[in-house]
Amino acid sequence: MGGLEEIRNEAVDLENIPIEEVFEQLKCTRQGLTSDEGAQRVEIFGLNKLEEKKESKVLKFLGFMWNPLSWVMEMAAIMAIALANGGGKPPDWQDFVGIIVLLVINSTISFIEENNAGNAAAALMANLAPKTKVLRDGRWGEQEASILVPGDIVSIKLGDIVPADARLLEGDPLKIDQSGLTGESLPVTKNPGDEVFSGSTCKQGEIEAVVIATGVHTFFGKAAHLVDSTNQVGHFQQVLTAIGNFCIVSIAVGIVIEIIVMFPIQRRKYRAGIENLLVLLIGGIPIAMPTVLSVTMAIGSHKLSQQGAITKRMTAIEELAGMDVLCSDKTGTLTLNKLSVDKNLVEVFAKGVDKEHVLLLAARASRVENQDAIDACMVGMLADPKEARAGIREVHFLPFNPTDKRTALTYIDAEGNWHRASKGAPEQIITLCNCKEDVKRKVHSVIEKYAERGLRSLAVARQEVPEKSKDSPGGPWQFIGLLPLFDPPRHDSAETIRKALVLGVNVKMITGDQLAIGKETGRRLGMGTNMYPSSALLGQSKDGSLESLPVDELIEKADGFAGVFPEHKYEIVKRLQEKKHIVGMTGDGVNDAPALKKADIGIAVDDATDAARSASDIVLTEPGLSVIISAVLTSRCIFQRMKNYTIYAVSITIRIVLGFMLIALIWKFDFAPFMVLIIAILNDGTIMTISKDRVKPSPLPDSWKLNEIFATGVVLGTYLALVTVVFFWLIHKTDFFTNKFGVESIRNTEFKEMSALYLQVSIVSQALIFVTRSRSWSFVERPGFLLVTAFLLAQLVATLIAVYANWDFARIKGIGWGWAGVIWLFSIVFYFPLDIFKFFIRFVLSGRAWDNLLQNKTAFTTKENYGKGEREAQWATAQRTLHGLQAPEPASHTLFNDKSSYRELSEIAEQAKRRAEIARLRELNTLKGHVESVVKLKGLDIDTINQNYTV
């Protein structure tokens, strides 16, 4: 193995020496390596992957204490021992220890959960590890690219990411995109003997290659060593920072007001003032926020993977929740991609050829191994698949590529004559055969006939090769026939599209097939037939009715596009994003990569190429549209949990800061910082369970609305703060509870007032999560078992502390079960208005409140709900009449009805629903057949009439 050591040390120039010398130096042959040789070479060269930086577990743990929210808590800890002096008391060690414990608890939970999430993500990403076709033990097989070693023989084809640095063997030239490595914008041609680099993408061709370098020894590996990874600040991080900053600023304002009032105006003692400031710092900071949100995302990501959608980028979850347009491939996503040919409909164009021979030529122009769906269909149509190569010797196979859109086989028959058979897109084959005008007309007529039935067309041609060379152009091509391909829709596609529309997601079909096929498939799936050819995207459509319509508007209103090339997909995504839509795009091929990268959510479908997977945000492990729609629902649940928590966190900050500031300044009552710590620790323990809470997903696409989060948080927090102020006034200045419930008076008893105030703040603070987690009444939407259990346990502990604890250092004394019962009753009574405030804020933020007040003067009406239902019904009727639809049955609505508040779909989805409704009513064997026969009889234009159908 001495020679291999030199290769590992890069002492041999394998990039430039002749290919035969490469085999000598690597001690291998064109038959590849054995498994044993591969294992031995892994010991020498290592696995074919880049070395991951080992992160110190200790530094990672401490990293969770290094963020703006933690800094505020750490500042509070320093204040507790450095500034909290005087008044004849020692430094505040209890608070210092308590703050450190709180920080350690949060960091520990974050560390454990992120570690678990990281392990789960690593296991998921292992499923996405690049695979490659490698020749081992004399057999071709698909293996993980990480096992490759110098000397392995690999196969590289269209859409593959080159798995290692390699030298090309005999075969056709490849087109390689190495822009990611060298910056070259156009694909470069690589001939046999040339070197290809790990990480570049095959754009055209197919060839075998011998591996010469792996892992860190590759061109890509060396470049990666020179570049530090850049930390991109994602949208999620920006939102997190904005919410954290809002809380920090709120606390800072409270502290400044306290300092100004307590010291210069009230002349309060220094030590008491510092403790009041500590209360705001400790209680106001949502220290658990980064932990709760990251854990929620990690758990959600794992749930998505179980449903068949692996998220490569964690923050894609929030974009998936906000997606309102999904551009979906037809083949394989909306349909089964299980093709069949109706032999009775095969059209023969060449003399002396029967339908069976057309099928045989199509099978010859197909692969017998490593097949795609069309190859499998063609070979499968033969009585015996072996007939595809029976009696002939294969010389050269031209694989499919997006430019030529055809495959071809050069072969020698039993008599020694050379022939070529080709199958592919009819337009390409017509051009290849240089057909006459009458033949073209006949071909297009048959294609249209197929398309009206929803059938795709496949053309077959042949030629003789008198020069007997695979590189020669050969004789003239002869157009042989047309085959009809039927790709049945998935059984669940129609229902899934209906669900998507109800969820406010508009599904647009993007297909390379003809317009007529797209329309027929759209009609069958109930997604409407408002489809356009790709030429309409460039404003070149022959349809005069489209000329006046701006391209942006056309794309927005279309149900789909036909005859689409990958560059059109990019344009569709770009235009929709300019119209402020959150766009999802599915793709599977190497040419889809730009559109997948451009889309807000790039979705690589099941069996996508390596290039499509690397460009996407989400990789599907199961076929069909239903996986995507399930993922949308799950993402909205995850997003809802995160949004619920952020509203809760902002509310608690405002409630603590405002409540304790008012009590400290009005009655000069100094609440113990240690008791706020107890509230914070119990709160954080409970709130961690929200990541697994049972939630109702938003009925419409959702996104971070910071104005809604801050407005709701401020209103709910202010209300709770005022409730606490009223409660303290009742126990501090009156005997209200003593008179009404017969409990002992604790008026002006500082330690007992502290216990009572602690319990009241603890109960309502935690109960608030049930309000923020629900869209309707909090007692109607059942929370998760874990959340309820954690709440009850935390409040049991809080109640026991208030009832029994006699802690002089925290200035509390047990108040007994009588007072505990009174405080629970008080908290429950003042809990109910929280829901009403929540509904009111939502109503005000929707803008409808101001419209009603200013435009309709609804403040002075006597109608139920200020006539809201009646006006909405009038609007809906007007809209439906405008589009030729019957008005729905009138339904009653209420201000706080969840379905009423959120039932309006986005305008674009509503339009698609209407078109789908019309399309379904035009099914065959109903009005459609009769109408079309009359139209043809009268010589009218069916397309014009379609636009004027009314129901």
From Swiss-Prot:
Q: Which residues lie on this side of the membrane: Cytoplasmic?
A: 1-60, 114-242, 298-613, 683-708, 772-784, 835-951
Q: What is this protein called?
A: Plasma membrane ATPase
Cited function: The plasma membrane ATPase of plants and fungi is a hydrogen ion pump. The proton gradient it generates drives the active transport of nutrients by H(+)-symport. The resulting external acidification and/or internal alkinization may mediate growth responses.
Cite the InterPro entries for this sequence. Answer: ATPase_P-typ_cation-transptr_N, ATPase_P-typ_cyto_dom_N, ATPase_P-typ_P_site, ATPase_P-typ_TM_dom_sf, ATPase_P-typ_transduc_dom_A_sf, HAD-like_sf, HAD_sf, P-type_ATPase_IIIA
The compartments listed are: Cell membrane
**Which residue spans traverse the membrane?**
61-81, 93-113, 243-263, 277-297, 614-634, 662-682, 709-729, 751-771, 785-805, 814-834
Enzyme Commission designation: 7.1.2.1
Into which family does the record put it? Belongs to the cation transport ATPase (P-type) (TC 3.A.3) family. Type IIIA subfamily.
Cite the ranges annotated as topological domain Extracellular: 82-92, 264-276, 635-661, 730-750, 806-813
How the protein sits in the membrane?
Multi-pass membrane protein
Q: Where is the active site?
A: D329
Keyword vocabulary terms for this entry: ATP-binding, Cell membrane, Hydrogen ion transport, Ion transport, Magnesium, Membrane, Metal-binding, Nucleotide-binding, Phosphoprotein, Translocase, Transmembrane, Transmembrane helix, Transport
Reactions accelerated catalytically: ATP + H2O + H(+)(in) = ADP + phosphate + 2 H(+)(out)
Domain of life (superkingdom): Eukaryota
Q: Which PROSITE patterns match?
A: ATPASE_E1_E2
Read off the NCBIfam families from this record: ATPase-IIIA_H (TIGR01647), ATPase_P-type (TIGR01494)
Top EC category: translocase
Query: Which amino acids does the record list as binding Mg(2+)?
Result: D588, D592
An example of a Gene Ontology cellular component annotation for this protein is: plasma membrane
Q: Which GO terms describe its molecular function?
A: ATP binding; ATP hydrolysis activity; metal ion binding; P-type proton-exporting transporter activity
Q: Name the GO terms of the biological process aspect.
A: proton export across plasma membrane; proton transmembrane transport; regulation of intracellular pH
Q: Which Pfam families match?
A: Cation_ATPase_N, E1-E2_ATPase, Hydrolase
Please classify the protein's predominant subcellular localization into one broad category.
membrane
